[in-house]
Amino acid sequence: MKIRMTEELATTRLETPIGPLRLAANPEGLVAVLFAVDPQELPVSQGAARARAHLSDAGTALEEYFAGRRTSFEGLKLAANGTEFQRQVWGALSRIPFGETATYAGMARRIGRPSAVRAVGLANGQNPLPIIVPCHRVIGSNGALTGFAGGIPAKKWLLEFEGALPRV
């Protein structure tokens, strides 16, 4: 995912058990959570004061999540760009409870588009806010762990951490 740097955009780096994350926000809310980004690609930037406040809120929420003290990201101000269909899928992703999984076919049914399984998969893959909009909770119909921006090992770690998969 490419992020266009502007004077209003604020970014920060967050160390997590699954590797470093880069967060980006504008004055409207959090716009991206990126995995292992090259620092030259998205440098840390102060941005606008309101953007920094959104970064602080998101950083605290993610730290609480990884410490086992948060199971939901409700209340965070999100400002991700996407099509109406993508936003519909991302909204449905946000309703998958902590510790549970859903299939792509199940997600398509949830949004009232049962034949749109592939489109749901594509929208899932375009989610700019992984973890916060929990696309890692979507698995294949056969139970297989499929694509994730942070890689399959990170997806497996997150699902085990949430208790959705037995730890091996």
Q: How would you label these PLM feature ranges?
A:
Residues 141-168:
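…primarily DNA-binding HTH/wHTH and HhH modules…
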Residues 97, 128-131:
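Histidine- and aromatic-rich ligand-binding microenvironments
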Residues 60, 121, 156:
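Active-site phosphate/pyrophosphate- and oxyanion-stabilizing loops and adjacent acidic/basic residues
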Residues 131-138:
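Short Lys/Arg-enriched helix C-cap and helix-to-coil transition segments
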Residues 93, 118-126:
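Major-groove recognition helix of helix-turn-helix-like DNA-binding domains
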Residues 1-115, 161-168:
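Basic nucleic-acid-binding alpha-helical/helix-turn surface characteristic of O6-alkylguanine DNA
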